[in-house]
Amino acid sequence: LRANADLKLTVIMTVYNQEKYLARALDYLLEQKNQQFKLLVIDDGSTDSTAEIAASYQDRFQAFDLVSKANEGVAAARNLGLDMVDTPYFIFHDGDDWVEPDYTDYFIKAFDRHPDDDMVTCGYYVDQAGKPSVPITKPVEGELTRIEAVLKVLGSAHSPVKGYTWNKCYKTQLVRRLHLRFNEDLDLMEDQVFNIDYLMQTEGCYYSSVPLYHYWQRADSAVHTVSWDHFWSIVGANISIYKSIFSHLWQKLLSKRPQTQEYQGSYVRERIKDDHQS
């Protein structure tokens, strides 16, 4: 690893048996207009040449770290990445996807322009073999409150935010302070659960639907394979999401309770005083 104290962004790329696609992902990162980022590749126990391909790129990035671990799933791999981040901001990148040249520059500059926002998001393309890239929505941008951002994450298929992690940039300090982790018991939607847990503790989000990320939809992807295990994982994820939302709202209600009681007490005292004077 060649560290640079001036780097602001870490790109966490978790990979597993992606020898067919990894070189493409890394080549596009090499073409970034802003190279002031660290690339952290977590190999989750690949049994093909994924690790060797990643290692061959080590000297081509300004800051690069490759970590190989036993296969435990994407959530555990991302959690290891969270433990290793040492830059102010970080973002996730899947090993079979690729990005536009402005990808890293956009996130770094967006946080510089919107320092009070705790998350920055971008738009994305959906890509399939033999088909042209399709942007997911029309260009829009702006700032969202906490609740607005949560609704976008939980929103429709054409939401410019959605629940993915790869089109979002996070503040490392906030994740550390809140001890946020990916749920390793979930096979699906662990990214959406993480995003809700994160957003419920934030002050706001800056979003743009300008597409900078290419989401490669593979026919053999686990996301597109239906099974009972996936069904129950989705059920568990939705339970976690709404528990997080209601827990935060309940805590917010309790935090206002002393003010409410003080107002009620003052109101009662004034009524007693009025009764004595009448």
Regions found by a protein language model. Give the residues of each.
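Cell-envelope/extracellular polymer assembly enzymes that use nucleotide-activated donors
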Residues: 7-10, 38, 193
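Short, well-formed alpha-helical segments that are part of the catalytic scaffolds
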Residues: 17-31
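Conserved short acidic donor-positioning loop in nucleotide-sugar-dependent glycosyltransferases
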Residues: 29, 44-45, 72, 95
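A conserved acidic beta->alpha catalytic loop
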Residues: 43-52
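Glycine-rich, basic loop-to-helix element that forms the pyrophosphate-binding segment
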Residues: 69-85
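Short aromatic/hydrophobic "clamp" motif used to bind/position activated sugar donors
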Residues: 90
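Donor-binding/catalytic cores of nucleotide-activated saccharide
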Residues: 95-205, 213-230
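C-terminal subregions of glycosyltransferases and related glycan-biosynthesis enzymes
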Residues: 214-278
